[in-house]
UniProtKB/Swiss-Prot annotation:
Segments of skewed composition (Polar residues): 120-143
Deletion phenotype: Narrow rosette leaves. Single shoot bearing a terminal inflorescence. Abnormal inflorescence with infertile flowers and filamentous organs.
Cofactor: Mg(2+); Mn(2+)
Compartments where found: Cytoplasm
Record-level GO cellular component terms: cytoplasm; cytoplasmic ribonucleoprotein granule; nucleus; ribonucleoprotein complex
UniProt record similarity statement: Belongs to the argonaute family. Ago subfamily.
Piwi domain segment(s): 676-997
Region (Disordered): 1-143, 165-188, 1005-1025
Binding-site list for a divalent metal cation: D760, D846, H986
PROSITE patterns registered for this protein in UniProt: PAZ, PIWI
Protein name as catalogued: Protein argonaute 1
Amino acid sequence: MVRKRRTDAPSEGGEGSGSREAGPVSGGGRGSQRGGFQQGGGQHQGGRGYTPQPQQGGRGGRGYGQPPQQQQQYGGPQEYQGRGRGGPPHQGGRGGYGGGRGGGPSSGPPQRQSVPELHQATSPTYQAVSSQPTLSEVSPTQVPEPTVLAQQFEQLSVEQGAPSQAIQPIPSSSKAFKFPMRPGKGQSGKRCIVKANHFFAELPDKDLHHYDVTITPEVTSRGVNRAVMKQLVDNYRDSHLGSRLPAYDGRKSLYTAGPLPFNSKEFRINLLDEEVGAGGQRREREFKVVIKLVARADLHHLGMFLEGKQSDAPQEALQVLDIVLRELPTSRYIPVGRSFYSPDIGKKQSLGDGLESWRGFYQSIRPTQMGLSLNIDMSSTAFIEANPVIQFVCDLLNRDISSRPLSDADRVKIKKALRGVKVEVTHRGNMRRKYRISGLTAVATRELTFPVDERNTQKSVVEYFHETYGFRIQHTQLPCLQVGNSNRPNYLPMEVCKIVEGQRYSKRLNERQITALLKVTCQRPIDREKDILQTVQLNDYAKDNYAQEFGIKISTSLASVEARILPPPWLKYHESGREGTCLPQVGQWNMMNKKMINGGTVNNWICINFSRQVQDNLARTFCQELAQMCYVSGMAFNPEPVLPPVSARPEQVEKVLKTRYHDATSKLSQGKEIDLLIVILPDNNGSLYGDLKRICETELGIVSQCCLTKHVFKMSKQYMANVALKINVKVGGRNTVLVDALSRRIPLVSDRPTIIFGADVTHPHPGEDSSPSIAAVVASQDWPEITKYAGLVCAQAHRQELIQDLFKEWKDPQKGVVTGGMIKELLIAFRRSTGHKPLRIIFYRDGVSEGQFYQVLLYELDAIRKACASLEAGYQPPVTFVVVQKRHHTRLFAQNHNDRHSVDRSGNILPGTVVDSKICHPTEFDFYLCSHAGIQGTSRPAHYHVLWDENNFTADGLQSLTNNLCYTYARCTRSVSIVPPAYYAHLAAFRARFYMEPETSDSGSMASGSMARGGGMAGRSTRGPNVNAAVRPLPALKENVKRVMFYC
């Protein structure tokens, strides 16, 4: 997951204003479990019923954490005890896990509502989710014993409707799996036609043959393999290959349209090495190539699959066609994954630090409902500029390297950037030999000597170049490049080397480079469509010798696809605002005349300013304006801080945070806590953001809101309104709810208690070989509202895609076999916060590629089943498992870019556009949904693929649910591009990486963008989880932070 730039600014959204709630309230003892949420001087119609009449809500007292015994029973750490902070949504109390002690009539400002919290799970124990129990049997001063809680879970009534679906047994292997068939096509919404970047490919009627290729001596480079096979075809096509033009995958497989005149044959091929060896000579190498018939590639089954008469996709046949269509572009362009790049496809753009962006295109053959489809999209990536090495080093260090000696840090940076890079020498005229850099010399060139004879006579590199080549080295203070192996290294002065063109930069980009690359890739839909069509014309598949050889014909026009535009959902806000409900327009709305449905409380807050540009008086003004915006949006926000804003230097972040926190808490009366820390950051803040979040959330126990200097100076109302939304959910409030959820009108969600999960795994950046992956799982904790999400995060094995800690089982010396895990903890939390056990599970899983579908489903569905069974014998609620994919290359364009009724302001298709025909899977349950309005560039629809469905969703049911949930994202007044549970899981995992590796960031502003997944370009492992792998655990979150959505 590339990291986003680190700021805590919210996504862009609507403007916000409103007024504070006011009204009578009475309360005593414990709050009503099912009624409205009453606190302070206003009536918050929260909870499930949203009843108009005032409800009783007491001010809770001191809360208590779960005892150690309970923690061990359910996998939580023994230290899970602490002060309560906020009652559940259906209680009016301020209390702990056992509920607060009731007080008299409440007269103060509204107390903070609890919100499900995100926790950190470590193996083998977990920090259990903390939501207060709402069972009437629980004493307000005592939490239930583990056995009691388990009994309560079992005793929950299922009279609201037991699942009628038969629970399907999980197959033992992927071969037995059948993904759900499409339950018909959706009918809801306004019908329209869109264009997709899919091009119809006519299935060939040729006889395809598969041959195994063995090249000895074996090489790891596909480029060398291809060069060998090209030489073979050039030499022997007419004489030995029956005039066939084979397609080669660069490894072990060769395919032909029709048989070769032999079943097995050996060839000898001589090839001149492109690179110079350790002795300075280009070797001519002989390769033995054995080509042996393996099988015929059957296209009959592919035709049956495309017609829907066969459920399993014949992967080999698809692979053959993909290899055939990649042959010509592989010879013309530079292949990177499934994409091809060239300086001729588009204008190169500088990315800084010696890098530049190249334009290219993505190409992949796919089975669809319309038959075979060639998916083509534009792409860009970073290449190393083909400059002299001296110039590259100057660009990398951003200075003239002749002005002062290189520091140790400079040498490390240069070595890291140049290792593995191919260079050519320039001091020998037209003889441009190529070498690959293996390192830098430890000493300067002027100090470097080497033996020239058997008597170990030493000669300096400076002398050698002058005597041998007549070249006088100018930059003798610089180290030499080292090429060849460590046993027999060669030394090349930097100034005689030039970087060879066409080398992709695969290491991690810095913030400036990411910004520049995003700017290059950002294209308006009409421009992207034109470039895609131009690429198809440039590739000219009709004249592609390989396509002709195999009988593949590619259409030259974009596919026209039937689509529907789903209506936006009505949203519920607090009745005391002028507008109690809202219907979003084109995927967005604003907070004007509206108030948060449940405003949180900030009584005690402080501000720390780390920006030298922001003076104290400006910091005070900014905080006052922000407090006012929170107030008018529906929160109870004290306009005066506990202490005046203080300025500090970023390098003293830990000392300042702890000192200021101590000073502020000392000033408060006993039992009071700091509710919020407002932080002003420099625009370029390095690792400050990550350090600050780590200290606040794992050491001090305080939620924080970071604001960049540029926003402090602008002080725009829209920015303030968005920050208010984030602050509200961080302190336990809720911004809005779906009207259909309150009126129980969501199919297969509202009829019985339903829990919605979101899960994601973020991986380290390429090159970080030892850092763990971070898994996050969130789950809804309110029903029927489904807006609040608790979660768990854990570190797991490097690049492990399967979530290892979904279900855990281990032996305890006293208790014997103990079960725990993320799913179990979240199910228990749902039970505590709603009073119901989930009778239906919907699981949105982000970040899974098609090749991982079977492994992820087999492992994670099994973990869900085991977690449920560990809570109650026979407890198996029906599960729907949906993969959410954003890293695909399907783009949808309006049929007419000039029709204002079919595009949004950015020229993209309208939010709510759903496609489940033609370009979708021939038989399985999948769809593309563009749930958001575009801001800039071309919108990427999310692809949802149902891998398991025991709830028997209709197409309309799942599509509408997914689209409507996209309007409930807490951080902005816009619909978002992926379903919020998956989005929250990603945010949680991303935040947890700050705890794990705060020192690795070289730029701390976090901005929205496509680099959020952090290292997503590198491969992911689906090996079976190794529970014994040593993974450094995440530092524990503090109790005050656990109970709020601090990651928003």
